[in-house]
């Protein structure tokens, strides 16, 4: 498995603003909680970027990332009501 990395300053901001961290994401990736992985819909602006849809505490989060030969770099964590409804059947 490739190394997973992220920006520590972004992680601190996500913990404060969204009460979720990249450590949470990595835990759920390892637990097999990825519902789907898609190409970013705007490949012109975000070339090569993909998005994991991950369940964390019964809520779906979008996690954009860039994958290289050496690592997977996590960009941010976005809570998604729309994806939660689609994949889980209801909002929390």
Segments (PLM) and residue ranges:
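Ribonuclease/tRNase effector modules and their secretory precursors
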Residues: 1-92
């Amino acid at each position: 498995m490739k190394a997973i990395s992220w920006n520590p300053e972004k992680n601190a901001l996500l913990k404060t603003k969204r009460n979720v961290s990249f450590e949470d994401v990595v835990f759920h990736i390892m637990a097999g909680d990825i519902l789907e992985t898609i190409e970013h819909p705007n490949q012109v602006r975000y070339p090569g970027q993909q998005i994991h849809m991950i369940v964390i505490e019964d809520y779906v989060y979008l996690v954009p990332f860039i994958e290289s030969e050496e690592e997977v770099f996590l960009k941010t964590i976005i809570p998604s009501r729309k994806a939660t409804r689609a994949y889980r059947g209801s909002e929390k």
